[in-house]
Amino acid sequence: MPNIDTATMTPREIVQELDRHIVGQHDAKRAVAIALRNRWRRMQLPEELRNEVMPKNILMIGPTGVGKTEIARRLATLANAPFVKVEATRFTEVGYVGKDVEQIIRDLADTAVKLYREQAKVRVRNQAEERAEDRILDALLPRRATGIGFDPEAARNEPSSQDNDTRIKFRRMLRNGELDEREIELEVAVNASMDIMTPPGMEEMGQQLRQMFSNLGSGKSQKRKLTIKAARPLLIEEEAGKLVNEDDVRTAAIEACEQHGIVFIDEIDKVAKRGEAGSSGGDVSREGVQRDLLPLVEGSNVSTKYGTVKTDHILFIASGAFHLAKPSDLIPELQGRFPIRVELTALTKADFVRILTEPKAALIKQYEALLQTEGVALTFASDAVDRLAEIAAQVNERQENIGARRLHTVLERLLDVLSYEAPDRDGQSVTVDAAYVDAQLGELVQDPDLSRYIL
């Protein structure tokens, strides 16, 4: 696919990009593509109208392993937007033991800050590399101190001609890797992070304590002896951190959260009330989680350590299998906040064939590449692919339907012997055909008891 500015991709281009990684589920791809394009459209509106246009949240309905999570994850990567995936079952009603739903937005803010900090470091990379080189050269060629009140920074800017010639020579050797094994002594910043365990529901307090201890130790450094090869990445990272303006990063990250953030809530069906015949304690608790989620989806202000995040324009994508519950079992207020409903279909044998061969990082390509590292040339005949897809479909039909994840189990079992013996088979070529598949898996597929526990 040609290079396209992802911010201005059309829905058709977004679907084509998703097709490179995910097989089928065209309706779901269309829905998320339109939602992403609507974000761009909204940003073109006058500010007064822009603030009135709310995102159309999406509810994905379909069995496990059909691509719900992968579609949302690929969409976030494509949009280069802050993205967080959570399970609805991890959260509890306020006042009970468990995670507070506002932690979702705090996690989103953490993701955004990390994303924008890395982008800022990429922008200053060249400058950071030059500074790191200067520090290495200073360690190799200490500058001559002259006079009272000698300023090494000023000396760095105005070196003598002899020093300059020597530094140019050493800089060239440094860039060519000729000095990589030389040991130097450097002042390196100390990482003051501390791991603090907190009880469930008190993660925010743990974060604040970690931040406090980190601030207490900031600015400290220690002398370390390192090879130039090991010191260089450390110094580049340290210098890039100095060049990045943290206030600008936080401001940009908060804005990105509010305008482009994507929250994927999995297993939303597990917090739906099941049936109409009376309410158990579990139903009451599940309804409480829904009511706590409601303000986030409707739009509210959430305090994070980087500032306040408004959730009005964050895109929420919820998903669930809805085997025991129906979308209508969600509380009406929450149903209304997910106006776009998309049903994902169960995968067939034909889908499994495509999953094994078509995506950019198809499973078969992954296993071929893994064994190639051992010098084993692995290839799959077309009849083997067909037989693998048939076996996966059969086992899914007879046992629990876990969708495409069944292919991982089947392939691991199929290649178990070959993976074990690969180091001893360097230089060999192995072709997997239908006969090989039947020899390795035939007995397991025919015996329902064995396939239940092994496949």
Curated annotation (Swiss-Prot):
Any matching Pfam family: AAA
Function comment: ATPase subunit of a proteasome-like degradation complex; this subunit has chaperone activity. The binding of ATP and its subsequent hydrolysis by HslU are essential for unfolding of protein substrates subsequently hydrolyzed by HslV. HslU recognizes the N-terminal part of its protein substrates and unfolds these before they are guided to HslV for hydrolysis.
Protein family membership: Belongs to the ClpX chaperone family. HslU subfamily.
Matches recorded under NCBIfam families: hslU, PRK05201.1
Keywords for this protein: ATP-binding, Chaperone, Cytoplasm, Nucleotide-binding
Subunit structure: A double ring-shaped homohexamer of HslV is capped on each side by a ring-shaped HslU homohexamer. The assembly of the HslU/HslV complex is dependent on binding of ATP.
Database matches in Gene3D superfamilies: 1.10.8.60, DNA helicase RuvA subunit, C-terminal domain, P-loop containing nucleotide triphosphate hydrolases
Name this polypeptide is given: ATP-dependent protease ATPase subunit HslU
Protein residues bound to ATP: 23, 65-70, 266, 333, 405
CDD domains the record matches: RecA-like_HslU
HAMAP family for the chain: HslU (MF_00249)
GO cellular component, one term: HslUV protease complex
GO MF annotation terms: ATP binding; ATP hydrolysis activity; peptidase activity; proteasome-activating activity
Example GO BP: proteolysis involved in protein catabolic process
Main location: cytoplasm
Gene that this sequence comes from: hslU
Locations listed in the record: Cytoplasm
PANTHER family reported in the protein's UniProt record: ATP-DEPENDENT CLP PROTEASE ATP-BINDING SUBUNIT CLPX-LIKE, MITOCHONDRIAL-RELATED, ATP-DEPENDENT PROTEASE ATPASE SUBUNIT HSLU
